[in-house]
């Protein structure tokens, strides 16, 4: 017989009745029923009920056992008495009568129990993460994470991609978030950086002649934590392809993500073909470039309607005269809501920094729509009808309004859309709703510096005839601000899973792109000379994307916080409470690295 086990704690079935077996695991729960002890024994695979009574030689040893002790038991499998079966356990039809028990590891009084899935402060859970990971839900999340990563790898290989590993120690990047720096002992005064992403390496892999690259890549960024972003490090499904168009990237990536989500959706619906939504359309219809399409509400622009001479609502008219816009957010069925519903939304809007949300409730009078509400009297019937028609409203519906400069009005309308959809129960929660966001602007106007600057990714290829682009006059702001880039995001349930782009592989086009934004060739050479040098030696057209693995797992585990799907996460202050990181190092280590500390005055 094996030293520790012949079976796992999730393996025994009625077919094993009568067999003598050995199990090892943790005491999940110990129950004393007056001379009969029940021990629920747990391991990675499941739970088995074990029984011992005073007739067993193991009874005295079993009496000393406490929760989370690690034990080895020998015994005979028997059926549970009729009526005591547990249908919730795969092993619930049987139990093990203990004939021998050995304590393999005792446990002191625990700072948090494993049994019961009770809520505990996050600090306690992170400090004792190894205990937290014994609990069923978190344990299952981590196992699901591994299965999802296995599925991603398999699907990428089936798509003709090859897995690569790129360096972890690299050069500091002048762009993006703050780097984590690693001092070099061999090169005093110089530092490596942990990669924020393998961006340059994966492009260099394409320039090196490889065709389809992928990697489950660790990325390191010194940035603040959020619910959907872990501080310090995260993982992404890094993808790059040679000789591809934007459509080729979509066709390669979409089946991978759809397939993984269908595999692990547990009954939730998954978008069939991911809709492609231009950036400008997303900002108008949803007020954000990462729309949650589970919500059916569509924002419409009603600036023209409120510009009508017959409209006397001066709060909106003054906004329009100043160059602002008015956006309408439909609220189907809201006419049946009490006044408190509208008051709550107005109070919420004030909390967002807006003066409130104007609204109109539509009723039917004599076969025609008639509006009521605080601003209805300032809007004549024909304008009300035009607004209702544009927003797709009928009797019993309402419409809310957000007004201001375009970016501010769009943002408020987008947040109101989510709030209204949730409050009215319109958002279909049991689905994964994907979309691509495309046609991002290449440039934008920097109002603070009064100049043209890059809008998003400066290294993406402009969606413009190359010869025409090279001949652009940098002073032609109207043309330049209308140029779109081959950039795209993939969004699921309002969460951005990734940004991607067709890369700018032509040095002449890249130099022109930076020149338009006011950056001279010397800036490019100084900051990105290595990449430019490679591009000058024969670079293929290439593009890619990098969906976040942690966010994918978070969605599929239905968790609101990314720390619930990471094995050993840091807290929001980028501290590992369990391992005590970051920590001080010895003077000897600092001397070896030629580093002298200049710490801030903590008393100041």
Curated annotation (Swiss-Prot):
One of its GO terms (biological process) is aspartyl-tRNA aminoacylation. The record marks 33, 83 as: Important for tRNA non-discrimination. It catalyses: tRNA(Asx) + L-aspartate + ATP = L-aspartyl-tRNA(Asx) + AMP + diphosphate. GO terms for cellular component: cytoplasm. InterPro entries: Aa-tRNA-synt_II, aa-tRNA-synth_II, aa-tRNA-synth_II/BPL/LPL, Asp-tRNA-ligase_1, Asp-tRNA-ligase_1_N, Asp/Asn-tRNA-synth_IIb, AspRS_core, GAD-like_sf. It is found in: Cytoplasm. It holds the Pfam family GAD. Keywords: Aminoacyl-tRNA synthetase, ATP-binding, Cytoplasm, Ligase, Nucleotide-binding, Protein biosynthesis. ATP binds at residues 221-223, 496, 548-551. The keyword Signal does not apply. Its main location: cytoplasm. Its EC number is 6.1.1.23. Residues 199-202 are annotated as: Aspartate. Belongs to the class-II aminoacyl-tRNA synthetase family. Type 1 subfamily. Aspartyl-tRNA synthetase with relaxed tRNA specificity since it is able to aspartylate not only its cognate tRNA(Asp) but also tRNA(Asn). Reaction proceeds in two steps: L-aspartate is first activated by ATP to form Asp-AMP and then transferred to the acceptor end of tRNA(Asp/Asn). Homodimer. This is Aspartate--tRNA(Asp/Asn) ligase. It comes from Methylobacterium sp. (strain 4-46). The lineage of its organism: Bacteria, Pseudomonadati, Pseudomonadota, Alphaproteobacteria, Hyphomicrobiales. The gene is aspS.
């Amino acid at each position: 017989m094996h030293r520790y086990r012949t079976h796992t704690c999730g393996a025994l079935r009625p077919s094993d009745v009568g067999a003598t077996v050995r199990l090892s695991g943790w005491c999940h729960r110990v129950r004393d029923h007056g001379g009969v002890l029940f021990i629920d024994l747990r391991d990675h695979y499941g739970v088995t009920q074990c029984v011992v009574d005073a007739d067993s030689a193991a009874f005295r040893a079993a009496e000393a056992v406490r929760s989370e002790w690690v034990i080895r038991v020998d015994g005979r499998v028997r059926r549970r008495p009729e009526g005591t079966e547990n249908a919730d356990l795969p092993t619930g039809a049987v139990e093990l009568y203990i004939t021998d028990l050995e304590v393999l590891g005792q446990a002191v009084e625990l700072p948090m129990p494993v049994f019961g899935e009770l809520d505990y402060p996050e600090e306690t859970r992170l400090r004792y993460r190894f205990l937290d990971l014994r609990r069923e839900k978190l344990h299952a999340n981590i196992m699901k994470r591994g299965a999802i990563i296995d599925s991603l790898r398999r699907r990428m290989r089936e798509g003709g991609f090859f897995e690569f590993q790129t360096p972890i120690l690299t050069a500091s990047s002048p762009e993006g978030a703050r780097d984590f720096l690693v001092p070099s002992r061999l090169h005093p005064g110089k530092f490596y950086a942990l990669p924020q992403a393998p961006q340059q390496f994966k492009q260099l892999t394409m320039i090196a002649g490889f065709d389809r690259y992928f990697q489950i890549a660790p990325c390191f960024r010194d940035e603040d934590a959020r619910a959907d972003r872990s501080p310090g490090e995260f993982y992404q499904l890094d993808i790059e392809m040679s000789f591809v168009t934007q459509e080729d990237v979509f066709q390669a990536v979409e089946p991978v993500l759809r397939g993984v989500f269908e595999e692990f959706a547990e009954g939730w619906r998954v978008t069939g073909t991911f809709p492609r939504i231009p950036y400008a359309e997303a900002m108008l219809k949803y007020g954000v470039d990462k729309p949650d399409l589970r919500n059916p509400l569509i924002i419409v622009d009603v600036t023209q309607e409120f510009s009508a001479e017959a409209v006397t609502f001066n709060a909106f008219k003054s906004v329009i005269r100043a160059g602002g816009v008015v956006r309408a957010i439909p609220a189907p069925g809201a006419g049946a809501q009490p006044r408190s519903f509208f008051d709550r939304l107005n109070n919420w809007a004030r909390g967002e920094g807006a003066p409130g949300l104007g609204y109109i409730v539509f009723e039917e009078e004599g076969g025609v729509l008639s509006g009521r509400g605080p601003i209805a009297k300032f809007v004549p019937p024909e304008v009300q009808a035009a607004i209702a028609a544009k927003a797709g409203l009928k009797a019993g519906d309402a419409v809310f309004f957000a007004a201001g400069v375009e970016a501010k009005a769009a943002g408020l309308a987008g947040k109101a859309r989510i709030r209204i959809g949730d409050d009215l129960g319109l958002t279909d929660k049991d689905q994964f709703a994907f979309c691509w966001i495309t046609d991002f602007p290449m440039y934008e106007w920097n109002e603070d510096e009064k100049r043209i600057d890059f809008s998003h990714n400066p290294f993406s290829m402009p969606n413009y005839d190359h010869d025409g682009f090279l001949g652009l006059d940098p002073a032609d702001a109207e043309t330049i601000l209308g140029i779109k880039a081959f950039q795209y995001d993939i969004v699921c349930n309002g969460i951005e899973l990734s940004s991607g782009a067709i890369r700018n592989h032509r040095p002449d086009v890249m130099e022109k792109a930076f020149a338009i934004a006011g950056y001279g060739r010397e800036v490019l050479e100084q900051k990105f000379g290595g990449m430019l040098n490679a591009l000058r030696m024969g670079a293929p057209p290439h593009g890619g994307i990098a969906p976040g693995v942690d966010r994918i797992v978070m969605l599929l585990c239905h968790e609101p916080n990314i720390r619930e799907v990471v094995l050993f996460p840091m807290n929001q202050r980028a501290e590992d409470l369990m391992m005590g990181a970051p920590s001080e190092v010895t003077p000897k280590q600092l001397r070896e690295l030629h580093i002298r500390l200049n710490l801030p005055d903590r008393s100041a």
